[in-house]
């Protein structure tokens, strides 16, 4: 495909630096421990009804680490490295000087990394994955994301820390995004970090319809009692 206007050289250099997988190099090491939300994000990223997933949460709860873990998982599962893009807006401040940074980088990615349009890749059964980290640093991220998913076939993860700005943007993306909220570590996650065992949530194996059945609550009590000692040790 014909090359369009390139990005500023410093931005291009940062993109190559932050995506060493494009050159067959390893990225930063990530912890083996995965937060409870990882499996849900991985499923939504590939099979969710909406083309984009928005991960919201306060700072320091692991959103960036989750994005990196998802990137690693994609690569370990055999996704071609040049079908992936990791774009952390807090690490490339000069991106904010561009008129439409998300769309500008997406076009550059098509031309110089993917080697074809996002739609062509998807139609060939090789959809691209775009991981956009800390988008609250962009005032107009939502209109750009809307344009991207309306006109290009790709799977997108968006993370953000500023709840008001993320919420305002999400409202304009109805039907195009699935929102997932993540907070501080759960008690069972602390147990997983400290003792290597993280109890599965009872709701995870049950449907909300079960809540009307009294037996459901007796089973929930028994389920929680089985891991009571683990939770108490984690709390201590």
Which residue stretches match the model-derived regions?
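Structural recognition of the conserved hydrophobic beta-strand(s) that form the central parallel beta-sheet
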Residues: 155-161, 181
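Hydrophobic anchor at the beta1->P-loop junction of P-loop NTPases
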Residues: 55
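A short, basic N-terminal segment
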Residues: 1-49
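Interdomain motor-coupling "hinge/lid" segment immediately C-terminal to the ATP-binding subdomain
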Residues: 2-6, 169-236
């Amino acid at each position: 495909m014909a090359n369009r206007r390139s990005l500023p050289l410093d931005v291009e250099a940062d993109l190559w630096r932050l995506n060493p997988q494009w050159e067959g190099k390893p990225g930063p090491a990530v912890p083996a421990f995965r937060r409870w939300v990882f499996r849900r994000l991985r499923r939504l990223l590939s099979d969710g009804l909406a083309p984009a997933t928005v991960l919201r949460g306060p700072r320091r709860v692991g959103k960036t680490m989750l994005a990196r873990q998802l990137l690693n998982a994609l690569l370990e599962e055999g996704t071609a490295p040049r079908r992936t893009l990791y774009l952390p807006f807090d690490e490339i401040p000069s991106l904010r000087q561009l008129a439409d940074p998300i769309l500008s980088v997406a076009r550059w990615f098509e031309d110089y990394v993917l080697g074809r349009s996002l739609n062509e890749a998807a139609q060939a059964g090789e959809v691209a994955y775009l991981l956009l980290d800390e988008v609250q640093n962009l005032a107009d991220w939502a209109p750009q994301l809307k344009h991207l998913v309306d006109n290009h076939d790709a799977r997108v993860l968006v993370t953000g820390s500023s709840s008001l700005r993320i919420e305002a943007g999400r409202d304009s993306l109805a039907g195009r995004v699935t929102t997932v909220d993540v907070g501080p570590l759960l008690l069972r996650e602390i147990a997983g970090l400290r003792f290597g065992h993280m109890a599965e949530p009872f709701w995870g194996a049950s449907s909300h319809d079960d809540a009307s059945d009294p037996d459901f609550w007796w089973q929930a009590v028994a389920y929680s009692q089985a891991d009571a000692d683990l939770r108490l040790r984690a709390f201590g």
